[in-house]
């Protein structure tokens, strides 16, 4: 195994080749050189552009082996699988209610805080979700 002699000054991560170090540094610089030819959105890594492109193509390469539902992103499939297992790892510190998704907990938490971050552009009314 090669020694990791290339270290990023920003993140502290070490790499065994200079090309990986350069990729890490590009992330910190915010350089965005990969542009979507459909909507113009730009990304700092080619793989993020490829992931984004799925929203235009509708590609969903990740399939749940229990129900057949498909997803564009692996992370979405992982979150979905909690539905089948019944796992609810996200617990409200205020009332103890549990949720299978972090986003559902965040939405629920706004009931306790009264936060209403969503605003209707038509009538300016605000909502918690």
From Swiss-Prot:
It is found in: Nucleus. Pfam families: zf-C2H2. A zinc finger (C2H2-type) spans 34-56, 62-84, 90-112. SMART domains: ZnF_C2H2. The keyword Metal-binding applies. Keywords: DNA-binding, Metal-binding, Nucleus, Repeat, Transcription, Transcription regulation, Zinc, Zinc-finger. GO terms for molecular function: DNA binding; DNA-binding transcription factor activity; zinc ion binding. One of its GO terms (cellular component) is nucleus. The keyword Metal-binding applies. InterPro entries: Znf_C2H2_sf (IPR036236), Znf_C2H2_type (IPR013087). It comes from the Eukaryota. Belongs to the krueppel C2H2-type zinc-finger protein family. May be involved in transcriptional regulation. This is Putative zinc finger protein 702. It comes from Homo sapiens. The lineage of its organism: Eukaryota, Metazoa, Chordata, Craniata, Vertebrata.
